Amino acid sequence: MQIKTKAIVISSLKFQEKSLIVKCFTLSNGLKSYFVRDAFSSRKASQKIAYFQPLSILEIEAVHKNKGTLENFKEIKTAVPFQTIHTDIFKSTIVMFLSEMLHYSIQEEEKNEPLFVFLETALTWLDHHDDISNFHLILLLEITKYLGFYPDVSEIDLPYFEMKEGIFTLFHTSTALSEHETNLLKKLLDLKFDNSQKVFHVVERQILLRVLIDFYSAHLDGFKKPKSLDILKEIFS
């Protein structure tokens, strides 16, 4: 089946000497993996590699066999031409980390249009703004809405957050956050991209990042801690 759709690049992996395997989150079909033959074989072919930087947003034409095998691109072009995301060291570190988080979080080949639209909007915002120190925290929390485990805030006045149940509780359990961690999470729940400046200091951001990764681990089978986590911590320390 031939399709035309937008796609967000999640990862690209060199295969043998000249080819690439590219994983994309597509608007039309969810997660798909594509084989790019001879991506490194010539100057013209190697220009394609620029399309596959982390979280690039593409317009693709592809042949989908939908048999669980690698699919093939027919045509690729940039859908959203980013100006700063892949050149600014802070932003490029964020997208490298977030692409790893999405790699381990989006696990099914099924359409999730609301998540795609949210990610496209968020990445466009990141490209056009400079006050981004809390961007990754807000994004990771918001993504849980679309993956089905956003915190239940109906009892948000209670002092502890229970990670496995995703609820606020009166009593501290073995899988609950401390009261201090819970208060930081409550502050994060109130934030949007446009009102997040200077809310947390460095240590608080690192606590929240650990909390969010643990939260993902508690709710997603097979989730792994991103290898780029230490780089992100270093950049924002």
Swiss-Prot record:
Keywords: DNA damage, DNA recombination, DNA repair. One of its GO terms (cellular component) is bacterial nucleoid. The keyword ATP-binding does not apply. The keyword Nucleus does not apply. SUPFAM superfamilies: ArfGap/RecO-like zinc finger, Nucleic acid-binding proteins. NCBIfam families: reco. HAMAP family: RecO. PANTHER family: DNA REPAIR PROTEIN RECO. This is DNA repair protein RecO.
